Structure formats: C-alpha cells, structure tokens
Amino acid sequence: MANYIVGDIQGCFDELMLLLAQCQFDKNQDTLWVAGDLVARGPKSLETLRFIKSLGNSAKVVLGNHDLHLMAVSLGIRNNKAKDKTAPIFASEDGNELLHWLRQQPLLAEHPEFVVCHAGISPQWDLATARLCAEEVESLLRSENYRWLIENMYCNQPDLWQDNLSGLDRYRYIINAFTRMRFCFADGRLDMDCKLPPSEVKESELMPWFTLPQRRALDKPVLFGHWAALEGYISEEVIGLDTGCVWNGSLTMIRWEDKQVFSQKALEN
C-alpha cells in the first residue's frame, strides 16, 4: 500500500502510463496523489481526466491553475488558450461529467504524514489556517455559486494575507496562494509575475515562498507542482515535483514510503 505523488501531468497521458508501469502502481492497493494541472498543453487532457477519475478513491487530486482555467473556458468566461489541447473535453459525451467531477476536487489534500497542493501554502498560514482557507473556496466551487467565483477569481490583488480579508478579496488570495504562487517579497507579498529559477532572479527582495524567513511552521512536509523552473526540489519541508514534462522535460513522481523518485522523459508528440 504505497503512496505515489506526481507532478503536473498537463495532459501528458502516455508519459503518466509509462511512469505508473515503471513503479508497478497497483490501483487496488496504492494511492496516486496528483499535484494539480491535470490538463492543458499536453496532447491527451481528456484521457488524463478519464483515467484519474476512473481510479476512484485510489486517486487524490488537488486543483491547479490550469484546471480552474478549464472550468472558466467551459463556462464561456475565458477563451481556450491557443496552446491548450483541451477542446476534446468539451466535445466528448462525458465532458460535463468530467468537469463536474473536477469541480469537486480540493485545493489541499492531506495524508497523515504530508500535504499536497498545486503551488504551495502561503507563508503567512499555519496548517490549520490553510485547511480552513482551502475549505472556504472548495465549498464555493462545489456550490451553485461556482460560476460567480470563477468569473471573478482572475486578479493579482490582494497580494498580502490579512485575517480580516473577506469576500472576493479573500477568495482571490486563497486561490492565488494555492494555485499560482511561486515567489514572495520579503514582507510576504505574493509576486505573480516571475517564473524563473531562483538562481536567475536579480530582484533581491524576491524569494521562493518556502524560503521566506518568517514562514509559519507547518506540521507536515508540503508536496507541490506548478514551478517547472525549479526542475524538482527536495528538502525536509517541501518537495517540488513539476519537472516540465509538457515543456519537453520529464514527468516526476515520488513514492512516499521510501522517497524513491521515478522519472519519465517527455515523449515526442
């Protein structure tokens, strides 16, 4: 009974299948944790959604920014990006069912020994706050008001957490922290623009969210995706799993029990 955590799949379904074969994943005994961005620029987003959904309780999924964007496109709120290969989802007979399933997924998933989210956990949150914030947005996404939330979630402000944030300001910050965050300024403000590796950042105030000196201590390690430029990052406190399969990099997965890392190079599409 092993736990496998995989980085951003982004529709790279064939690579996922090879990776699961490589580690001899058994859906009857093992659990696959997916760190968000199931869909987008890879060639088989539809197949990816179908497969992960078919795993039932053997899959634990968190939402990424591309998954939320897919919902916005499905509602006509946003246009499909030119490089996204998600059109087959909308044309499929089970497209609505898959989108409904996706909308039920959380922003934060928790194991007794670790937590999984797409981009990270705000450095100003402890784990209890992160749980509560995730649940606030999750309940809205699962409600009849989800269109209102998706329609209004696109905004980089506010960029600093305050406990008294309310309404859209609160929801926007929560969504940005869980699904879009990479760098923060020294005072904890989120930077929504820089996507570079930390070694290439010249702005002295910018630092990865997980290295902020005043970051609140968490009870468990955080496993996340989203940041391909990190090219994989492993420390005692955080594990970054996005290694840019969709950018001709690789799909990376870790087995929690022995920390063995599995990697599948991107196939030529």
From Swiss-Prot:
The keyword tRNA processing does not apply. This is Bis(5'-nucleosyl)-tetraphosphatase, symmetrical. Keywords: Hydrolase. GO terms for molecular function: bis(5'-nucleosyl)-tetraphosphatase (symmetrical) activity. It comes from Vibrio vulnificus (strain CMCP6). NCBIfam families: apaH, PRK00166.1. Hydrolyzes diadenosine 5',5'''-P1,P4-tetraphosphate to yield ADP. The keyword Cell membrane does not apply.
